[in-house]
Design a protein with these regions (language model features):
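A broad, low-specificity signal marking well-ordered, structured residues that form hydrophobic/aromatic
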Residues: 7-9, 48, 89-95
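Short beta-strand-centered aromatic/proline hotspots
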Residues: 35-40
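C-terminal terminal-subdomain/extension
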Residues: 64-162
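Residues that form or immediately flank small-molecule/cofactor binding pockets and catalytic motifs
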Residues: 14, 55, 99
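Sequence-level motif detector for i,i+2 pairs with an aromatic at +2
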Residues: 3-6, 45, 86
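Compact nucleic-acid interaction/catalytic patches
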Residues: 29-33, 44-81
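Short His-Asn-centered micro-motif
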Residues: 11-13, 41, 51-53
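GIY-YIG nuclease catalytic motif and its immediate N-terminal context
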Residues: 1-33
């Protein structure tokens, strides 16, 4: 699967089987490809950073609003619209993968569904801030992204030597 910026993807089960991280939002059983993931390329490593989308907007709006009330902002959840429905972009659950693990792009009537530019910009900005906080030792993301990144970078290195 070739990555295209600005779209949402589904991930192969193989990724979840490989990394074994209980904090990741896994594909649903029964062959349905959920959740969907917005993805951004890290130009330094070539890895893709996946941000799960949730349709459970009320649940995440309550968490978002509580953080805004307490801290004046919420970095880890972006509320917006995707594919004509309200959605929560869960940066608190983001993680890295290789392009190899992309299964397919999310479509509606066989057409790829883009993420609105304003949401893409907001997610990108917040992701950069979260990664900066993480690099300074702040725990803002649930998955063990350091371990996941090392697994993916090792695969990139192994594939480069094959």
């Amino acid at each position: 699967m070739i990555y295209q910026e600005g779209y949402v993807y589904h991930i192969k089960d193989e990724y979840f089987e490989k990394v074994q991280d209980s904090n990741l939002m896994q594909n649903k059983e029964g062959g349905t490809y959920r959740p969907t993931f917005y993805c951004l390329r890290d130009n330094k490593t070539s890895l893709l950073w996946m941000v799960p989308l949730s349709s459970r907007v009320e649940k995440f709006k309550a968490i978002h609003d509580k953080q805004v009330a307490k801290y004046g902002k919420c970095l880890t959840i972006v509320l917006g619209e995707f594919d004509g429905k309200e959605a929560a972009f869960l940066l608190q659950n983001m993680f890295p993968i290789r392009e190899y693990y992309l299964d397919h792009i999310h479509t509606r009537n066989n057409n790829p569904v883009p993420v609105k530019h304003s949401i893409r910009r907001e997610v990108t900005t917040r992701m950069k801030k979260i990664r900066q906080l993480h690099s300074r030792g702040k725990k803002v993301v649930f998955p063990d992204i350091d371990r996941l990144e090392q697994i993916m970078l090792a695969e990139v290195k192994d594939n480069a030597t094959e």
